[in-house]
Curated annotation (Swiss-Prot):
Keyword flag Transferase: yes
Source species of the chain: Shewanella piezotolerans (strain WP3 / JCM 13877)
Broad class of enzyme this protein falls into: transferase
Gene: upp
Cofactor: Mg(2+)
Name of this chain's protein: Uracil phosphoribosyltransferase
Protein's pathway: Pyrimidine metabolism; UMP biosynthesis via salvage pathway; UMP from uracil: step 1/1
Residues holding uracil: 193, 198-200
SUPFAM superfamilies, A to Z: PRTase-like
Protein family per UniProt: Belongs to the UPRTase family.
Cofactor binding description: Binds 1 Mg(2+) ion per subunit. The magnesium is bound as Mg-PRPP.
Any one GO molecular-function label of the UniProt entry: uracil phosphoribosyltransferase activity
Coiled coil: none
Gene3D superfamilies the record matches: 3.40.50.2020
InterPro entries listed in its UniProt record: PRibTrfase_dom, PRTase-like, Upp_B, UPRTase/APRTase, Ura_phspho_trans
Length: 208
């Protein structure tokens, strides 16, 4: 599995700000979108282009346009919504596919509860977004679902990942690409990433 830990100074700085214990909901939400945008920039760097001729201000001009599969952004509810706007800055015409997963606090296993995907999934590249890759369960289950619907071109974008989650995702889906702002130290007994960001969903939505 291709794993890219984006080490751009802006990414490192913004993730550092997100780790502050007293970060406000507004600030955390803004930073989640900003880092999501920067991860998208990296994840789309290998998109193929083709030359086309358009009518410019002074006559025909040859330009490059992205070709290949159309993009669908797949936020995993609910926390993935916090990264979605940042992703859409770069691919504003992308279709949005929504998958609802929550983690059982006792078993730490993902439980699906909602699915609304774009049409023609086999023809699309999916950018799956979720702030945290902890055990990897929610991401793996979401990718399972996408593949069941015929989508074979998939990239996962997460703010922070635990080594355990990276290993689990690689074992389940070695053909998927992972882009993250940070691979942190480990998971604690409750399944939270250390040092991590805390509960990203609560911080994005202002719930406790």
């Amino acid at each position: 599995m291709k794993v890219v830990e984006v080490k751009h100074p802006l990414v490192r700085h913004k993730i550092g700000l997100m780790r502050e214990g007293d970060v406000s909901t507004k600030r955390f939400r803004e930073l989640a979108a900003e880092v999501g945008s920067l991860l998208t920039y990296e994840a789309t760097a290998d998109f193929e282009t083709e030359k086309v001729t358009i009518e410019g201000w002074n006559g025909p001009v040859e330009v490059e346009q992205i070709k290949g599969k159309k993009v669908t952004v797949v936020p995993i509810l609910r926390a993935g919504l916090g990264m979605m706007d940042g992703v859409l800055e770069h691919v504003p015409s992308a279709r949005i596919s929504v998958v609802g997963m929550y983690r059982d606090e006792e078993t730490l296993e993902p439980v699906p509860y909602f699915e609304k995907l774009a049409s023609n999934m086999p023809e699309r590249m999916a950018l799956v977004v979720d702030p945290m890759l902890a055990t990897g369960g929610s991401m793996i289950s979401t990718i399972d679902l996408l593949k069941d619907r015929g989508c074979t071109s998939i990239k996962a974008l997460v703010l922070v990942a635990a080594p355990e989650g990276v290993a689990a995702l690689e074992k389940a889906h070695p053909d998927v690409e992972l882009y993250t702002a940070s691979i942190d130290d480990c998971l604690n007994e409750q399944g939270y990433i250390l040092p991590g960001l805390g509960d990203a969903g609560d911080k994005i939505f202002g719930t406790k």
